[in-house]
Amino acid sequence: MITVYTKPNCVPCNFTKKFLEENAIQHSVVDVTKDSVALDMIKLHGYQGVPVVAVNGFDNSWQGFRPDRLEELKEVAE
C-alpha cells in the first residue's frame, strides 16, 4: 500500500500524485492539514515537509518528489 502525505498548493506533492495517477499506481492521499494524527506520524519519523511517500509503512519511505524512487514503484507495478 502506498500512502502519499501531502498538503494543498504543494508543487512537489502534485508532481508525485500526478506520476502515480498517470502510471496507474494505486495509492491513497492524506492531507496533513486536515489530519493532525498523520502530521504527527510523519514528524515522528523525522520528516519535516511533504510530500512523504510511504510504501507498506514507513520502513520504505521518502520525502520530496523523487522520480527515481517513483520509477521503482512503476517497475514493481508492471
Predicted ranges, named:
Residues 1-25:
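Local sequence-structure signature of Cys/Sec-based thiol-disulfide redox active-site neighborhoods
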Residues 1-3, 27-28, 57-60:
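Short active-site oxyanion
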Residues 7, 47, 67:
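ATP/adenylate-binding site constellation spanning eukaryotic-like Ser/Thr protein kinases
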Residues 11, 36-37, 68:
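Short alpha-helical
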Residues 41-45, 72-75:
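Short amphipathic alpha-helix with an adjacent loop that forms part of the alpha/beta core around
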Residues 45-54:
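Structural micro-motif
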Residues 55-78:
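Non-catalytic, surface beta->alpha helical segment in thiol-disulfide oxidoreductase systems
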